[in-house]
Amino acid sequence: MKGQETRGFQSEVKQLLHLMIHSLYSNKEIFLRELISNASDAADKLRFRALSNPDLYEGDGELRVRVSFDKDNRTLTIADNGIGMNRDEVIDHLGTIAKSGTKSFLESMGSDQAKDSQLIGQFGVGFYSAFIVADKVTVRTRAAGDSAENGVFWESHGEGEYTVDDITKADRGTEITLHLREGEDDFLNDWRVRSIISKYSDHIALPVEIEKREEQDGETVVSWEKINKAQALWTRNKSEIKDDEYNEFYKHIAHDFTDPLTWSHNRVEGKQEYTSLLYIPAQAPWDMWNRDHKHGLKLYVQRVFIMDDAEQFMPNYLRFTRGLIDSNDLPLNVSREILQDSTVTRNLRNALTKRTLQMLEKLAKDDAEKYQTFWKQFGLVLKEGPAEDSGNVESIAKLLRFASTHTDSSEQTVSLEDYVSRMKEGQEKIYYITADSYAAAKSSPHLELLRKKGIEVLLLSDRIDEWMMNYLTEFDGKAFQSVAKADESIDKLADEVDETAKEAEKALEPFVERVKTLLGDRVKEVRFTHRLTDTPAIVTTDADEMGTQMAKLFAAAGQAMPEVKYIFELNPDHPLVKRAADTQDEARFSEWVELLLDQSLLAERGTLEDPNQFIKRVNALLLG
């Protein structure tokens, strides 16, 4: 026994409490949802542990949560007979936030209360939400399997510190008493509390009971009335479940405040029997890019909770999917290691992956506006799909959205089906360009001929795009073609060159040889091009060579890569090229050629190895 001690909250807890009390006040009734949700989790954990140790039930296997209030003392109590906590667990769970990235998350919070409320909601406030309506919270708990004298008392005013002490508690589980702030008497009203519980907790499998007091023969008789359906929502028939119930269940399992964009509820019977309920959130979780954070579904086996974040059932590129799977084919004592090597798991993963992709395809078809919300939140994650899941590339490709020259907007709204439907007669390929930004892609000289011919080009500017396009090779039988790479199909688009122009071009052949001699092995090849209308020169790469954006990706990852060898393509009709060709002075000629090459490299890469030399060269030529 350690006796009473007063401890300081972890600094992040203090910050979270302050933000939460101010940001969530307009939605304060959610504290009851959060506390009942925690009680439900405690019951799930007890059921799971009792599979291997039935003695943990201590002769009481009827799990429930009870809500009562004391109007005289202005307290509201939520009590469960779930797994309970020992002293160390109380300190870990109620005094600290054991989530990586918490500090940076809190630092990102600002003064925008609506935004803060959403962010805190997706962070998952849980127990601390009690302080929205209470100025003091008392907890009495005992872990299942411990003796009565190992109970723990915890109390705090939600400011800088809390008190923890040893107590005797005969029954296992956790009892949380909220000492309500002035003006919160609404939560001492029987009808009000019932309506909140019905609204938020009808879907959970744990019975929620409210205290009833009746006068009989001059005595007060206390009884407990169940006020929720207490049937796991996913086990009910879809036809019986209202949208509001699906939305509330999502908020319960995802600890999110906003409704999901869509969901898919399915029961499968036959070779494998399982029920899945999958949701697509409306906003990305704050820690979606945190590599330490686990993403996955809740796993139930025959309606018994087994684990959170079972990541084996969903590929990484669909890690935003929330929900659960309830399998009849896995053993109750299943572990993460068993899941890793299970044929059942692999089959379920394949089925759930297809189900999620179908759900997204349906959303895109039925509600373009909602799908655009999804794309803005999760498009970058979905773009990991072609590299990760070769078996579903066609399905993933249908879900991708791009900016393009057709829309003249940086918004990524164009689907590949849209693009193919607008292809010109005789066009065989889907043209795209990758660049560091939308502006750089849109203004690239590589687009000049295609714009002139009215051929649409997809404008890709996310860092992942170049990598993705290595795995996205075709769609609907049409190959993808980077316009920054040498390609006959683009060259064929150029207008037929008349005899006079051919003669003029032939006369310039010695100029090409002079350029080759000057540049040597700094470029792979020098040649004329008819791709350009306004630009004097560009650099391209061969189809099988590494492109500029891929080289940048490797460099950003700290890997040394061989230098990209460019093809230097000159526009024979451009006045600057003609001037360079007419220059006989070798020093002056060198300046013109170097300027044209630097311009081309700057347009392609966005940077030069020696920008100062480029500036000097431009200034010298301007002074003429």
From Swiss-Prot:
<comment type="similarity">
    <text>Belongs to the heat shock protein 90 family.</text>
</comment>
<comment type="function">
    <text>Molecular chaperone. Has ATPase activity.</text>
</comment>
<dbReference type="GO" id="GO:0005737">
    <property type="term" value="C:cytoplasm"/>
</dbReference>
<dbReference type="InterPro" id="IPR037196">
    <property type="entry name" value="HSP90_C"/>
</dbReference>
<keyword id="KW-0143">Chaperone</keyword>
<dbReference type="InterPro" id="IPR036890">
    <property type="entry name" value="HATPase_C_sf"/>
</dbReference>
<dbReference type="InterPro" id="IPR020575">
    <property type="entry name" value="Hsp90_N"/>
</dbReference>
<dbReference type="InterPro" id="IPR019805">
    <property type="entry name" value="Heat_shock_protein_90_CS"/>
</dbReference>
<dbReference type="GO" id="GO:0016887">
    <property type="term" value="F:ATP hydrolysis activity"/>
</dbReference>
<keyword id="KW-0067">ATP-binding</keyword>
<dbReference type="GO" id="GO:0140662">
    <property type="term" value="F:ATP-dependent protein folding chaperone"/>
</dbReference>
<dbReference type="InterPro" id="IPR001404">
    <property type="entry name" value="Hsp90_fam"/>
</dbReference>
<protein>
    <recommendedName>
        <fullName>Chaperone protein HtpG</fullName>
    </recommendedName>
</protein>
<keyword id="KW-0547">Nucleotide-binding</keyword>
<keyword id="KW-0963">Cytoplasm</keyword>
<dbReference type="GO" id="GO:0005524">
    <property type="term" value="F:ATP binding"/>
</dbReference>
<keyword id="KW-0346">Stress response</keyword>
<feature type="region of interest" description="C">
    <location>
        <begin position="553"/>
        <end position="624"/>
    </location>
</feature>
<dbReference type="Pfam" id="PF00183">
    <property type="entry name" value="HSP90"/>
</dbReference>
<feature type="region of interest" description="A; substrate-binding">
    <location>
        <begin position="1"/>
        <end position="336"/>
    </location>
</feature>
<dbReference type="InterPro" id="IPR020568">
    <property type="entry name" value="Ribosomal_Su5_D2-typ_SF"/>
</dbReference>
<comment type="subunit">
    <text>Homodimer.</text>
</comment>
<dbReference type="Pfam" id="PF13589">
    <property type="entry name" value="HATPase_c_3"/>
</dbReference>
<dbReference type="GO" id="GO:0051082">
    <property type="term" value="F:unfolded protein binding"/>
</dbReference>
<feature type="region of interest" description="B">
    <location>
        <begin position="337"/>
        <end position="552"/>
    </location>
</feature>
